[in-house]
Amino acid sequence: MGVKTSATLSLRLLWTCQHHSKNAFSVLSPFCQLSWLVLKVSQGVVQSPSQYSPLLNMLSLHAFQKQYPRRQPHTMLCDATPLVPLSLNRVIEQPITSTLPLFQLPVELINQVTPYFSKLDIQSLSLVDRDTNQLARALQFAHVTLDYSDHSMQILTKLKSEVECPSRRRHRLGACIRRLKVSTIREHFNAREQISFEELQGLSMPDRLRRIEAAKQAEACYLRSICGLLRHLPNLYILHWNDAGPLTDQMMSSIMASSIRHLKLDGPILNSQLLLPYYCGSWALEGLYLNVGRSFIDPAKGSVAPFVTSILKLVAPTLRQFVWCGYAERLSPSAYHIDEDIRFPVLCDVVLDQVKFKDMSSLQRFFPDETILRSVSVDSDLTVSRFLASRGRIPSLDSLRWDWSPSASEDEMIQFIHSNPQLLCLDVTKPLIPETIDTILVQRKQPRFDNLVSLHLVSQTSAFPPQTLTTIASIESLRHLWLSAGAQHGMRYQWEIDHDLIMESLKSLADLETIVFTRDSYQVNGHTLLDTSPERYYMNKVLPKDLLLNDYLTEDELKKADPNPILFDRSIRLQDTLRHLTWERWHQSQMVAYATEYSQVFTNLKWCFMGQLSMRIDESIFWKIAELEVEERDPTLTRLHAYWDRVTRNVN
């Protein structure tokens, strides 16, 4: 059944459910039932959603609390720098008895050597004796992800056994974990608990609800068991809680009792009016990331502001970075007000993304008159932009990121940017017309920024005109440049990039080390019957009409392409696979050639990103060429964002 047919059938079934008896509702598939309930609850038609509570339990199980995609991910300070290795006495926790020569070295030298161990080295090390096995585990399990997979369940079982049956004769796996991520993958969960839509479809309604309730209890028990282990992980430094399950008072108590210094709550649903439990003194967090919301089916739904306020009061004395996102409440956003007089003496990094405030007084808590803020990331919400315009210059501010907002206000944000000419990094992810870009960067044909090192701009038009490129080139201090144009989302790529024009216009940027192009597309001289438009370059994957497959396929691959007497359908699939493989390799060769040209123009260039590919510049006394870092394209820009954050956070 096609997608269109399935969607039409679902709509007809929903109409039947809405206009006829309850019996019609019971024959719908679980997906249709949930779709109908979500629609009616959001419209306010279902005034008492508790009557459907067994079925609504599936909402969290199947992640119906919609997670809106980030326009750009926010990197925590702890993620931008590698973890400091633990000393051996903290990992082994007992006197070292191993005779391995490695342990005769000073501890500081051991920590310098271990990063160079390969996976094979670590496997061999684990077989020598107890102490080397614990050292190997400290390298393997410094970062652990619990995602409900079989592997994560084995880790969880091992950690539980260490707590329930402690032994002084055995080293503990729990002592090795520095960074813990809790992120349930729904495919793993559904398979283990047998609640996929296909499995539920064959059950009667009572059996279906019993299966759902059992899965709900299993999920709650799983999350509680993780929280119960946190206090037994003595070296845990970072906790990333990326699970959509409800967050309870008991779970927060366990999190607060742990040794973490950085907490990321990204997506959990707060139970009714959850506040932090009473906690004497402060909570020594250095980094806090909040993207939390109330369940939209909860009749007692309230604002998350009291929860945020209570946690900020505890962490304020030591907090260095605060990230507050409003994506988890996008279905029913509310405006926040923080009436507590909270002071952040060491706060240096603030991110406010899709968070609405009732008034400007709440923002004053994060931007006081006396501040050491170095990095600020905000959208152009009307309240935020007006406050920043009135706030004016922040002498300590080095980095500013301006994201798009539905209630955009450009004039106030531009005024704030102009008030801070000392900026080293400027990221404007909001698409702007070329005239506005010129207004931001220059004044009376002179650059407004003398020390700008990193610049990220997005053109609202389908290309950067020569005048705007000339304006960018006037900022000769630039070392890192990221340009994007046209539509920023979806499959339509509107920027048919002109590399010759860009190289000619920007050649005065002699210190350029990083250059990035996103949403760039290319024209192909393909077959006349094929759609070769740049907008569909990455989707259609059209090859040049004079291209020879022999140049991009191996001998074995060419043999597969030879039309042997095989099934027609299989032959078509095989030819499509080889054609796509050929296109990817041809595309890689084109991007490598362009990047090599850029390295000839910009002699200090070290890294570039174009055509969704990341490349480094390999230089010797004999050559200077671009090389792919990885062969796979990065259409979601995951690797790009990670690299860009590392670079911009270390500018000076």
Where are the regions that the model predicts?
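Short, solvent-exposed loop/turn at the beta-strand->alpha-helix junction
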Residues: F189-N190, A220-Y222, G245-Q250, I269-L274, ...
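N-terminal adaptor/linker regions at the entrance to substrate-recognition repeat cores
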Residues: G2-A7, P30-Q33, V38, G44, ...
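Intrinsic-disorder-associated, low-complexity terminal segments enriched in Asp/Asn/His/Tyr and depleted
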Residues: H19-H20
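A structural signal for leucine-rich repeat
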Residues: S253-S258, L276-W283, G302, P306-A316, ...
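C-terminal capping region of solenoid repeat domains
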Residues: L59, F189, F197-I212, S399-R401, ...
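Core solenoid repeat modules with strong leucine/isoleucine-rich periodicity
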Residues: G326, P345-Q354, L363-P434, V453-H456
